């Protein structure tokens, strides 16, 4: 009731349900997978009325032996002993620069410090077996991320997110 009537909701749950037979969720983590993020970005583009590239415009990359947050939460060795592949997609044919500003957050989720802006990759490469692979996109949550691409279409987007939103921005570079 407080949003402008021009703000359009994007129902990602129905879209994810249509792809439930695919690997849209990570088995060892509490997040959806990069493929789930792809379908969410696709639905966002449909609702926004903007073009969207299919997966053939992305390079498929894999970090093998990923064990996500569910092991950290549960300490259940059956999760640790059954790692999965963390499959993600990097846009082809588009150049981009990513600038970050890190923030320090206390236990009450209050910002207690701000770092200086720095340039780093958008897609971080993790070694096989590394438990941090979910941070492949943007390297985590406690930072402001600005991406400038070689796509000149006059559009801009701002994403306010928690960790579930990490999978979305990499599909919006075109």
Walk through the language-model features, giving the residues of each.
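Extracellular glycan-modifying ectodomains
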Residues: 1-174
């Amino acid at each position: 009731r407080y949003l402008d009537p021009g703000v359009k909701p994007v129902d990602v749950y129905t879209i994810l349900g249509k792809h439930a037979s695919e690997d849209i969720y990570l088995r060892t983590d509490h997040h959806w997978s990069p493929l789930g993020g792809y379908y969410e970005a696709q639905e966002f583009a449909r609702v926004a009325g903007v073009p969207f590239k299919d997966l053939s415009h992305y390079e498929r990359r894999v970090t093998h032996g990923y064990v996500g947050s569910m092991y950290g939460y549960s300490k259940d060795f059956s999760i640790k002993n059954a790692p999965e592949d963390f499959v993600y997609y990097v846009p082809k044919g588009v150049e981009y620069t990513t600038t970050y500003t890190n923030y320090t957050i206390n236990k009450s989720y209050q910002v207690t410090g701000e770092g200086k802006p720095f340039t780093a990759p958008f897609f971080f490469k993790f070694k096989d077996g590394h438990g941090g692979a979910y941070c492949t996109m943007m390297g985590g949550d406690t930072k402001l991320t600005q991406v400038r691409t070689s796509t000149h279409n006059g559009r801009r987007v701002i994403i306010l997110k928690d960790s579930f939103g990490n999978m979305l921005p990499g599909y919006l570079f075109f």
